[in-house]
């Protein structure tokens, strides 16, 4: 397993890809596999950890040379495994060119913009490419997608409250497409208090917060910082609903799944993978406009919170995710390109 080098596995706070990698590791181990993970040196996932970069060089997402160094050393180190599962952007393109590399399965966690299409169109010649949602796969164009494997969680890791509190919660990055500013307007429209927990480490995130979000805060809309671990889950479990007014075709949306695992209904835009995760009228409501989301919030107490948790357990378990990837690992080892 090759994780990006920027954050530990699992991440201490925000870090969707790293949380998914941790889940895959645990699911595979339950299925009886031995797992090696190339990752950030502070990683604590239950597997053999191999790290190739000192701590001081990691932590700033997007430094190309840092990721390249991590990827090359990871591939050169992993000659003793049966198959490599790569979660980086650079790895699927350059890693298989290293001598003696095992078969490669690659998962793309982002959008298929033009640059990523060019990368994965070429990488697909020698790797099994996996999409994380039908929506993401549909956006890939002529990129050769081998399969779709949804993310999974273990609901036993998530707290559950039969009756939610009186507040709504927003969780995500502090960027325009995640919609924190929309969340405040929608919550205020129906008179429901809102708590916002969001990643705000990079300069563009801080600039957006100061310009578009901070002026809207007040007694009914509170920014509580970036939360991780139990603090994040307790906030989710105690909420009346997760408000997710995204402005983009999100490839998956892990926060929606985490919310359902806590038994908290989701009210959000019907964009990207949201319809694959949220059963409209069953575990939440999806709409297109702020007015539609506001109207949905008026009905959110009709949603059975236990049904939300059961939905996550039955449709998005670690076991289902691990099984999906096991199938791709087997296909990769049988592929004549791996010979």
Task: Give the positions of each predicted feature.
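Catalytic cores of nucleotide-sugar-dependent glycosyltransferases that transfer UDP/GDP/TDP-activated
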Residues: 1-339
């Amino acid at each position: 397993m090759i994780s990006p080098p920027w954050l530990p596995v699992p991440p201490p706070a925000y870090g969707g890809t790293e949380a998914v990698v941790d889940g895959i590791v645990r699911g595979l181990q339950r299925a009886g596999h031995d797992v090696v993970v190339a990752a950030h040196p502070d990683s604590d996932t239950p597997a053999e950890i191999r790290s190739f970069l000192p701590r001081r060089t990691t932590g700033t997402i997007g430094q190309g040379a840092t990721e390249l160094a991590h990827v090359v050393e990871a591939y050169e180190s992993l000659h003793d495994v049966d198959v490599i599962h790569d979660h980086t952007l650079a790895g699927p393109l350059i890693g298989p060119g290293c001598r003696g590399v095992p078969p490669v399965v690659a998962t793309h966690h982002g959008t298929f913009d033009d640059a990523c299409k060019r990368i994965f169109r070429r990488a697909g010649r020698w790797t099994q490419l996996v999409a994380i949602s039908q929506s993401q796969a549909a956006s890939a164009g002529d990129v050769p997608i081998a399969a779709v494997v949804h993310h999974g969680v273990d609901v036993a890791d998530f707290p559950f409250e039969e009756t939610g509190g009186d507040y709504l919660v927003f969780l995500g990055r502090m960027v325009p497409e995640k919609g924190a500013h929309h969340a405040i307007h929608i919550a205020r429209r129906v008179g429901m208090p809102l708590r916002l927990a969001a990643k705000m480490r990079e300069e563009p995130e801080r600039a957006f917060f100061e310009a578009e979000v901070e002026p809207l805060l007040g007694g009914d809309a509170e920014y509580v910082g970036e939360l991780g671990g139990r603090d994040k889950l307790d906030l989710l479990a105690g909420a009346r609903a997760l408000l997710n007014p995204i402005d983009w075709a999100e490839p998956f949306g892990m926060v929606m799944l985490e919310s359902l695992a806590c038994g908290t209904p989701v009210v959000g835009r019907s964009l990207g993978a949201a319809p694959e995760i949220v059963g409209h009228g069953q575990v939440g409501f999806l709409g297109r406009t702020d007015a539609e989301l506001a109207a949905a919030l008026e009905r959110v107490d009709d949603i059975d919170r236990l049904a939300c948790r059961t939905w996550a357990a039955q449709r998005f378990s670690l076991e289902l995710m691990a099984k999906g990837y096991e199938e791709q690992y087997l296909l990769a080892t049988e592929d004549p390109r791996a010979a």
